[in-house]
Curated annotation (Swiss-Prot):
This is Polyamine aminopropyltransferase. Residues 211-446 form the PABS domain. Pathway: Amine and polyamine biosynthesis; spermidine biosynthesis; spermidine from putrescine: step 1/1. One of its GO terms (molecular function) is spermidine synthase activity. Catalyzes the irreversible transfer of a propylamine group from the amino donor S-adenosylmethioninamine (decarboxy-AdoMet) to putrescine (1,4-diaminobutane) to yield spermidine.
């Protein structure tokens, strides 16, 4: 017989196991998005498979006819081990196993099945002590409350503070503690024989998870080094992304969510090609806007022009600009550009920021990550470009990176078509960057009328006001605008906010080249 006080403690168990269950689901979805890309597809698949596994676990519970309390505790301990170590082990397995997705979804099915077993078993344990209506209402209320806790804790505290690996281990520990606690709360329902062994296994699982928590940083570094192919020298997890910097004998590399952003060996080619064409067109630009580019490297190039009075950099993630100022190798590489008096840093979603203000700029440089998901894809939409157009002066120019026109031609030309549909005259150009291959850019200005100034479409002459470039020369600048036959325009529709075809193009084209 379970007394009234332990009954209330069992409700707390419901709250804990519900929170743990949703956290495991969120971890799987986040991990899949981080490693495989396309967050909408990955989360949709994870949620669907996980919910199906919950149902399968609930169905299986009918075949547990005896020793309910013992089976419940065994399930908690199994879930503690599998759920707690699932994320670290999947991180380690990713670069080594070709059939990683099968392993990922297999773990989701097993964890979901175990979670699906928990509540039916606990409800059957409680049914002898509560009326049916009271049992259902209380258990489900605590179950949904646990889901609320999980959904709030995960993005606000757990991922930014603990990271994915430690979050998984912490909730594995909670499951193990529920199991250990159950050996005392449910003592009247447990046979004395084997009880010490059950508690011993619970302590063993807790010990393993504590050891895993202590070594979580080492596990994370090993997994990322295997995935990224270099020694991790800096890592940070923000509410928006995972930031990692690797180093090899040639230099250091920045990765965001596992995707390479630049290599210090040849980043100057990319950033000179991004910045100097538009600054050569906007010869006397005084106010310059940089969207993205929190590494400070594009700003470094803009500050070469003495006539620039102010640079406003808008980057969503403070962790990125903190890296640019506090990680000494990057601070040296960007010339401490973000610390200059002429530079103002704004931490804001660029989509919202562009739509809220009215200050206008003489030149705009856009250095967003590639449109690999819908949250970034909105920054390449016609709606965004329409808003941005209102923040540009009449003679302003705009430069944007547009992924590779060779590897992803539909993605590249979709970006340009979107800008044209938003009222810009657009000129394509490209540059060879050894780390990335052929990389695409676009130079644009507001179209005044269908018969736009033809001089705009001519290759701009490299400004005589800039010095110290390592890549661009007057003849090199002209060559950027000479597209070969295999990079000619494609007939693709524009990218709209409510139909982000660009993200699908990008996933399709880059997925084929992985």
């Amino acid at each position: 017989m379970i007394h009234r006080a332990p009954l209330h403690l069992l409700y707390l168990n419901v709250l804990v196991i519900a929170t743990c269950g949703l956290i495991y689901e969120l971890l799987a979805g986040t991990l899949a998005s981080y490693l495989l890309g396309d967050s909408v597809t990955q989360f949709s698949l994870i949620i669907g498979v996980y919910l199906s596994a919950l149902g399968f676990g609930a169905w299986l519970s009918q075949y547990v006819t005896t020793k309910l309390a013992r089976v419940f505790i065994e399930v908690e301990l199994a879930l503690a081990l599998l759920g707690g170590f699932s994320t670290p082990l999947l991180f380690l397995a990713f670069p080594m196993i070709e059939w990683f997705q099968w392993l990922l979804f297999g773990s989701v099915i097993v964890i979901g099945t175990l979670v699906g077993l928990e509540l039916p078993l606990l409800m059957r344990i409680l049914k002898e002590h509560l009326e049916f209506e009271e049992l259902i209402s209380r258990v489900l209320a605590f179950d949904y409350l646990g889901a609320l806790f999980a959904s709030l804790l995960f993005p606000i505290f757990l991922v930014p503070r603990l990271g994915l690996n430690r979050t998984a281990i912490v909730f594995g520990l909670l499951n193990a503690l529920v199991g250990l606690w159950g050996t005392y709360l449910l003592r009247p329902l447990l046979a004395k024989k084997g009880l010490d062994g059950l508690r011993g296994r619970a302590f063993l699982v807790i010990g393993l998870l504590i050891a895993g928590f202590i070594k979580a940083d080492s596990i994370t570094s090993l997994a990322e080094e295997n995935t990224l192919g270099g020694r991790i020298v800096y890592a940070d997890t923000s509410p928006y992304q995972r930031i990692a910097v690797t180093r090899n004998e040639k230099g250091f590399q920045l990765y965001l969510n596992g995707h390479l952003q630049f290599n210090s060996v040849d980043e100057y080619r990319y950033h000179e090609a991004l910045v100097h064409p538009v600054m050569s067109v906007c010869k006397d630009a005084r106010r310059v806007l940089v969207l993205g580019g929190g590494d400070g490297l594009a700003v470094r190039e803009i500050l070469r022009y003495d006539h620039v009075e102010s640079v406003t950099l808008v980057d969503l993630d403070p962790a990125m600009t903190r890296l640019a100022t506090q990680f000494e190798p990057l601070a040296e590489l960007n010339g401490r550009s973000l610390e200059r008096d002429r530079v103002t840093v704004v931490h804001r979603d660029a989509f919202l920021w562009v739509g809220e203000g009215d200050e206008q700029f003489d030149a705009v440089v856009i250095d967003f990550p590639d449109p690999g998901n819908y949250s970034i894809g909105k920054l390449y939409s016609s709606r965004f470009y329409n808003l941005l157009r209102e923040r540009m002066t009449e003679d302003a120019g705009l430069a944007i990176q547009c992924t590779s026109p060779l590897v992803a031609p539909k993605s590249y030309w979709c970006i340009l078509r979107t800008m044209q549909a938003s009222g810009f005259d657009v000129t394509p150009y490209h540059a060879p960057v050894p780390t990335f291959g052929i990389w695409g850019f676009a130079l644009a200005r507001i179209a005044e009328d269908p018969e736009s100034d033809s001089d705009w479409r001519l290759p701009p002459e490299l400004s005589a006001k800039v010095a110290g470039l390592r890549y661009l020369t007057p003849s090199t600048m002209a060559g950027l605008f000479d597209l070969p036959a295999d990079q000619q325009p494609r007939d693709v529709p524009p990218n709209r906010l409510n139909d982000q075809i660009l993200v699908r193009f990008y996933d399709e084209e880059w997925g084929q080249n992985q």
